[in-house]
C-alpha cells in the first residue's frame, strides 16, 4: 500500500494530554486510533490491520481445536438476562451494561458478554449427547458502561473481543476442553509476540466453578499478580491465597482500656502506643445491598497488618444469601448520619459490637453479619476498638465462634507471604494486564435458561458449559506496553500492520524513484506485507514517522541508489544491512524468518 493514496498515517508531533500510559500515548501519537469521546475510539486503517492480524491468529488456533465461528446480536432482550438473574446486577447501581427501551417500552441491553444469548440458542439446536461437545466463538464489538474510562483501549466503553462458549455432556468433558482452550490461548499469545502468565482468578459476575486469567506483565498493568519464582503458583490478587507472616505477641503487661484520642487508623494507634499492626484487629463496617431484600450490615474483622480482599468478601456474602448481591459498600461517617445511628463509634469499633447499635437503622437488617479472617481468629490476645469513641481495649481469649463469627479467608495475599502448597516458597508480585479469561461455568446458565440434552439412556440433563474471552484490542495495546522504546512502537512482526516500510529519501531523484518502484513491486509479487511512504516530505519526517509507527523493518533508498544499493534496518535492535538491491528480498526474507521464529 502507498501512504499517499490508500494509507494516510495521521501521526502527531505532540503527545495528547489525556493519555496516561505509554501505550495509549503511542496509539494516539502514531495515528492508530482517534478519540471520539471518553472511552470511545475510531480504529484507523493502520490499527484495523493490527486487529485483523490478531483476529486471524485467534481464528487459526481456535479452528484447530474444533471451534466454529458465528456472529451473535449485540442488542439483547432484557427477558433473557432476567431469566439468568443477571439483569439487575448488570444494569442497577454500578452495573456495566448500557440499557435502553424501544418505542414499545421493551427493555434491551447492549452486550458486554453473550452467555444468555448463546445458551438460549443452544437450547434450541442441541438436543442429544451425539451433538456434543460444541464450541462457538465470535469476534465483535462489546460495550461496557465504564464509570471512569481510562488508559485508551484498556478500559473503554466500546472494544473488540473474542468470546467463545462450549457445551458438554459431562463435567469431565468440560474440564478437558477447558485445558485444551487454555493451551490454545498460550499459543495465541505467543504467536502475537507477547510474554504472558496464566493465573488463578476470581470468576466475578460471569460465575462458574473455576477460572483462569492470562496476563501480560507490564508496569502499567492495573492488576496485581502474585507468583512464586519456581512457577509452582500464580494468581491474581483477587484470588490468591497464602500463609501470612507470624504476628508479634502482645506483651503480658498490656491490659484493660487504652485511651486513643482521635486515633482512628491502625497507623495512628500503633505510632502513639508503641504497638505493631499485627497485634491489632481492625473492624471494618460494610453494607451489602441485594436485589430483593433489606440491606445487610457486615462486621468484617482482620489483623491490622493485613488488608480485606473485597472480592473474596463479596463472593462470601453472595453465597450466604438467596438474593443476588448487587454491591458491597464500605460505611463511612456520612452513611451513619444518614441512617440516624447516633453515637455510633466508627473508627473505634471492636469485634464485640452489639446488635443494639443498629436497631434504629432504616432499611437495614437488625443483626450484624459477622466475619473474621483466619489470620485474626487465631490471636489469643489483641487490641481492638472499645466501642467507645477515643478508646481501644485489650481482648484476651475472646471467643469469635460464640459471637456467631464466620471464620473465612477474606484477606489479600501479599508479597513475602508463604504459599500453602510449599511453605518454603515466598510470593513475589508484579503488575499485569488481563488479555484473556477462561471459565468453567458448570450448569449455571443451562439450568436457568432450560438448555438440556438427552443422554445415551434417554434422560434429559442440563448442558455443561464453558466460556472463553480474549480482548483483541487489549492485545494490541498490551503488545505496545511490552514492545516500545523512546522513539515509538516496536511491533512484534506477527501483528505489525506491515512487515516492512520502504522510505525513499528524495522522490525527485529519478534513480531513487525507479528503484523504489522496482523494490515495492517485487515485494508485492512475493506477497510481502509492505508499505511505501511515497510522500514528498523531508526524509527526517519520514524516518521519525517510521520509528513512531513501529513497523519491524525499514528499507531506506537514498544516495547510494546510484550504485543500486539500499539499507535494510531492523526496528527493534537497529541492526543495519547495506546491500545491493538484487539481494534485498533474499536478505529481508531471511531476517524476517528469524524474527517470526523467535516468537513462534
UniProtKB/Swiss-Prot annotation:
Spell out the InterPro entries in the cross-references.
Answer: aa-tRNA-synt_IIb, aa-tRNA-synth_II, aa-tRNA-synth_II/BPL/LPL, Anticodon-bd, Anticodon-bd_dom_sf, Pro-tRNA-ligase_IIa, Pro-tRNA-synth_IIa_bac-type, Pro-tRNA-Synthase_IIa_type1
Q: Per UniProt, what is one GO molecular function of this protein?
A: ATP binding
EC numbers listed for it are 6.1.1.15
Biological process, per Gene Ontology: prolyl-tRNA aminoacylation
Q: What SUPFAM superfamilies does its record include?
A: Class II aaRS ABD-related, Class II aaRS and biotin synthetases, YbaK/ProRS associated domain
Q: Name one GO cellular component term.
A: cytosol
**Reaction catalysed by this enzyme:** tRNA(Pro) + L-proline + ATP = L-prolyl-tRNA(Pro) + AMP + diphosphate
- Class of this enzyme: ligase
**Carries keyword Protein biosynthesis?**
yes
Where are the disulfide bridges?
none
Q: Where in the cell is it found?
A: Cytoplasm
| Domain-related comment | Consists of three domains: the N-terminal catalytic domain, the editing domain and the C-terminal anticodon-binding domain.
> What's the protein name?
Proline--tRNA ligase
Encoded by which gene? proS
